[in-house]
Amino acid sequence: MEKSKNIWSLILTEIKKELSEEEFYVWFENLCFLESVGDNIKISTPNLFHKNQIEKRFTKKIKEILTNNGYDNVTIVFTNQSPKTYSSKEESEKTTFNETFPTLDKLKGTTLSKEPLQSIKDRIKMYIKKEEEPKNFKNPFLKKRYTFENFIIGPNNKLAYNASLSISKNPGTKYNPCLIYGGVGLGKTHLLQSIGNKTEELHNNLKILYVTAENFLNEFVESIKTHETKKFKKKYRYLDMLLIDDIHDLQKKEGIQEELFHTFNALYEDNKQLVFTCDRPPSELTNFTDRLKSRFTRGLNVDISKPNFELRVAIIEKKAEEDGIKVPKNILNLVAQKVTTNVRDLEAAVTKLKAYIDLDNIEIDIDIVEKIIKEIIIYEKETTNEPSNKINIENIKKILLRELKIAHKDIEGHSKKPEITKARHIYAYLLRNFTELSTIEIGKIIGGKTHSTVLYSINKIDRDRNKDKEINNLITELMNKIKKN
């Protein structure tokens, strides 16, 4: 036992030579010699975090010290087991660090920091957790109903699904950070929650937190009011995985953006997984700091678009099965044909069908389905300003084709003739200025173009208007005619 204590004291002496006073205090002052079994020397750490960090930072150096001093066969084993769990006999035999090596108080002199010891202790409280960390970090916002197994995969979301599943299996590796973007009700939250649930299942030792951007903001504001910002930072910067939903809700909120920036850096630099969802690509976020947007684009940005007909049918079938109702094929196809907005609206249609069956005890016919569809479409228009978008799109297209003498099939086709390409650039620019459509939605309207292509078109017309008077006059004339209609 005495030999083992001497070996541990030797290790401390050698490491002390290479660390600053504060580093040495942070990592080694609270270590405690527990016991030696054979060639294993067991050392107690204050908590699991401390244990993991000690092993990560100093294992190589400790092995080097042992080898250089002829103790190749000796192994230092760190544990977060408390010395209090040992018997009184073992307690009387163990030697703490303070007994085998001088404390900072004894070491104080001209070579040490002039800063008071208590001040050092206060500063490092943010760095070392003094309390034992829970083995399982419970996340109150993760809902078990969201799983990869009940997520319906189609061409519109397959890439996002595969990336999300990969993240769950190997967090903090390939796709970090990851940002999933797309319109309302397309499954972003489902995937984000599924990542949390699957990761918790596969890696139950990890600390995973799912929050909406609104919750994140509210917590931050509350921490300022109660003077507990340190607690807020500590909560979010010791995570293994942070999932934030609807990041676009933080637009125009500089204070929380600043906090998110530093939280992002702290986690990213420690290879912790970050996943966000947004209703648009990062480049389209307004009143959002450039340095934060650049952080989002470091990893994978993947979009989810509206479901095609086949996927809409599959979604309705699955929802009907879950609700225990049988939907005739003609009814199912009618709903899938008419409700083209998103998954949420499709499920709402099935819920309404179930209500008619359960509450009114009637058979579903075409008239009832038409009524349900009409209610959903009217509500969708009211909440998304869709009428003005649809009117504008038709007006824009009509005026553009007429003024530029371009055929309908060409503007939405793949012709690379200069005049057609130019017309597409203008079309994208006008759609961007007269509607609330995202670049992804605009891309689909003008022939399946990508977000990057649409953004290029918009920026090109912007540049051309500034340097080409003829182009500027043409765009101004087109915009005036669209406004009149």
From Swiss-Prot:
PROSITE patterns reported in the protein's UniProt record: DNAA
Region (Domain I, interacts with DnaA modulators): 1-74
InterPro entries xref list: AAA+_ATPase, Chromosome_initiator_DnaA, Chromosome_initiator_DnaA-like, Chromosome_initiator_DnaA_CS, DnaA_C, DnaA_dom, DnaA_N_dom, DnaA_N_sf
Locations listed in the record: Cytoplasm
Region (Domain II): 74-140
Keywords, sorted A to Z: ATP-binding, Cytoplasm, DNA replication, DNA-binding, Lipid-binding, Nucleotide-binding
One Pfam family matching this protein: Bac_DnaA_C
Keyword DNA-binding tagged: yes
Comment, domains: Domain I is involved in oligomerization and binding regulators, domain II is flexibile and of varying length in different bacteria, domain III forms the AAA+ region, while domain IV binds dsDNA.
Record HAMAP family: DnaA_bact
Name of the protein in question: Chromosomal replication initiator protein DnaA
Provenance organism: Borreliella afzelii (strain PKo) (Borrelia afzelii)
